[in-house]
Structures are given as C-alpha cells and as structure tokens.
Amino acid sequence: MSESTETVASARCAIALGSNLGDSLTILEAALKALAQTPGVALEARSQWYQTKAVGPPQPDYLNGCALLTVTLSPQPLLEALLRIEANFGRIRRERWSARTLDLDLLLFDAVILNTPTLQIPHPHMTERAFVLVPLAEIAPHWIEPISGKSIAQLVQTVDCSEVRLA
C-alpha cells in the first residue's frame, strides 16, 4: 500500500461501518474517533447503530452504521486510510463474508463513479443492502446515488428492512 497524500479541494463521502467480533459498540465508537483524527478527514454526521443478521456463513449478528465525512483526500488515499484503521482494530482479511472486528466501506464520494482494480465507487453492493441503506438514509436521505440516479431515501424503499433494527 502506498502512503499517497493525493488531495482534493474538498469532497463529501459516505462510509459504512460494521463489526461482529469483540465489543462491537466500543470498536465502532473508537473507529469513528480514529476517523475524525485522520488528517484530511472531518466527521460531519453519523447514524445510530443498527443490529443486523450476518451475510454468509453462520456468525454473530453485526452492529452497523454509516458516517458522512468531508475529506481533502482523493478516493484511493481515503481507502488506504480506512484499511489502516481496520488493521489497527485487528481486522484480518480472510474469506469473503467472514466475521470481523471492523469493516469500513467507502460507499459514495461526491457524485464520482470510479472502477479500478482496488476500488469501486459507488460501492457495488450498497443499493442491495438494507444494513447500509437504512443508516445512510437516516443521515443522507437526499444524496443521489450516481449510477441509479435515485436518492438514498428512494433506494431504501426497494430493499427488505425487516431484519434491520436499532441496537
């Protein structure tokens, strides 16, 4: 991973946070603090925490939420910062959908559409996931997802939210 410091004037982005190993509430709160202390990142808003069933093999339920950031980092350096924070909280990347101490996903970056080998913006599965859309709609209902052209409030109406409950 490069220690790129590529910057932009200022951008608004949305991230998803999740945890299902360890003291998830403490981990997620500490991750928000770590984000806010990251150079080039300002925490603007955060959702409440939601409990959801895990996707994939049997494992503990997740605690999920979303945050809005104002950043002066471009997308790739921001992703690298998110990955460093995950690693600092003990995240070990194994198989897909495995349990994790901390998962930070870059969902949206202004109206950018980006597809590189290491990063896709918008996040490729965000429009299918109630555990992302419910907390995101709480803090950014009018944000337009650039591929569908729909607001987050519209997108959340297209998924089954019955398994997403306030923690």
Regions found by a protein language model. Give the residues of each.
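Flexible, gly/pro- and Lys/Arg-enriched active-site loops
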Residues: 40, 44-47, 52-63, 73-79, ...
